[in-house]
Amino acid sequence: NLNSINDKKFTFIKGDISDSSLISKILKNYKPDKVINFAAETHVDKSIFGPEKFIMTNIVGTFKLIDTINLYYQDLDQNKKKNFIFLHVSTDEVYGSLSKDAPPFTEDHKYFPNSPYSASKASSDHIVRSFYMTYGLPVIITNCSNNYGPHQFPEKLVPFTILNAITLKKIPI
């Protein structure tokens, strides 16, 4: 739903998470107490044929973003620090593949990435966690599975499955 894009509470800023200068300006201008990182290169198959983009966005980009956010956080007064959270949206792909009889993944599972995509997301998770452990930056890491929504690329699992079902094609399992 893009109708709310015209709401005065919404501001769209085109940028790159690797642009520390831009991120710093945004933080100084808006003074957020919550930051959510949805930025990522996400297609497993594309990572196999072109991993560099995944490394640059998911690892280097996440590092530059969280490093800039940490500098912002360290300058906050104690009251604002109490309310600050950095939410890093990751993937269940960091845990590897499940066999048919295996129990579902939990946060206690060890990382076992199987592709450049999942390795880049696992690396970014470790970077984020290290900023919590080293600098005390409050972070939350989620390991979502097959997110979907409007305007999603049709090769992603949920839209691909739906399109195959309504056109009576084979559905992947």
Segments and roles (model prediction):
Residues 1-147:
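N-terminal Rossmann-like NAD(P)+-binding domain of SDR-like oxidoreductases, especially those catalyzing
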Residues 122, 147-160, 167-169, 173:
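Glycine/proline-rich active-site loop of Rossmann-fold NAD(P)-dependent oxidoreductases
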